[in-house]
Amino acid sequence: MIMRIGFITLGCKLNYAETSTYERKLLKEGFEAVPWSKGADVFLVNTCTVTEHSDKKSRNIIRKLHRQNPEALIFVTGCYAQLKKAEIEAIEGVTRVFGATEKSRIVPAILAEVRGEKTDETKAPTFFPAYSSGERTRSFLKVQDGCDYKCHYCTVPYARGESRNIPISEIIPQAEAIAAEGIKEIVLTGVNTGDFGKSTGETFYELIRQLDKVEGIERYRISSIEPNLLTEEMIDWITSGTKFLPHYHIPLQSGCDTILKEMGRRYDTAAFARKIQYIREKTEVEGGPKVFFGIDVIVGFPGETDELFMETYTFLRDVVRPAFIHIFPYSRRAGTPAAERKDQVQDCVKTKRVQMLEDLCATLHQEFIEANKGVKEKVLFESTDRKGMMEGYTGNYIRVSRKYDPEMIGTVADIIL
């Protein structure tokens, strides 16, 4: 009998890449992947724990799966599974929970369970290589896992473990396999992507130089990189005519030096501003595309007064001027230094500040679009057919629509914005 399996992925693109890899491996073993809402014999839930809401969502989904599929096997992994393993094991219907360093055991454990065999508990690799597949244009390639930074608000280092990676020599074949599927764009992903090399004595700069040589891949994006790890040497090389696109996702978290210090971040606003300016100077030419900056910001960190928040607002509006702001209201996470502070910010204040930054983001994004009008760009068109239209993204991440043409799927075309 063919076993049906449903996959549920919560959280980041790294989780998405890992789930896609579990799916590929299980399909090779004869499983049939089905939408989880349709019911299945087995479920694999890949959880997130970045906020308290993420934890709650994970619990609710697990309970719903068991309620609707009381005979199904339910396996759980992901960041929430690492931090609260006993809590998840106590949920009715859960078959087994896998922590951050146990991901290589998941597929063998599922196979053993459905076949009635004994699970192999010998030591498994702590790094689980992964990349997403199934899309015809873009793949997320995991190059790094874990984080050695201990920012005062974050549980991810505890959920994902220490920074680790496999060698470049093992990553290149994965990129080549992605290219063999006809995929043109790879997004490099990790927990602290720029910290690549801790396990192997290599560097992220060495990695991207080798990936740039992979035939068949035309475009690369870096999903997120800490500002202190994005070096001028790296920027000089990226802007020298490589396959790496003018699209930078950089976590700022606060535009106030007081808050940055209390968060335990590794830079100040002056250093951040210099990095942004350097990238613009090295990338932008008159009449050419503008650089896309996506900036992460946390609002309502303990001790953030209205005046300190306005420092962030002003820094974003007048200095960084990103194309997009990823806004996160601070979430109190047990076990972190910030959670113990007495000067917590009220939720209603966080909501107001989120709205202010969302309004600013809308303005800045529109200005970014306007600044790129009339510019010649390359667009990688995707397969989605939406009311007779298809979409794609420029190198600097502007979404473009055109009449649907199946022959354009996965092709890079020149357009005038």
Regions found by a protein language model. Give the residues of each.
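Conserved SAM/AdoMet-binding glycine-rich loop
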Residues: 74-75, 83, 180-306
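Short acidic, glycine/proline-rich loop/turn micro-motifs
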Residues: 260-263, 337-341
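Residue-level signal for inorganic ion chemistry
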Residues: 44, 79, 106, 188, ...
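Proteins enriched for Cys/Gly/acidic motifs involved in redox and nucleic-acid/cofactor modification
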Residues: 1-195, 209, 233, 269-286, ...
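Terminal RNA-binding accessory module
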Residues: 340-417
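Glycine-centered loop/turn positions within well-structured domains
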Residues: 104, 149, 194, 228, ...
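Short strand-connecting beta-turns/loops that link adjacent beta-strands
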Residues: 38-39, 148, 253-255, 385-387, ...
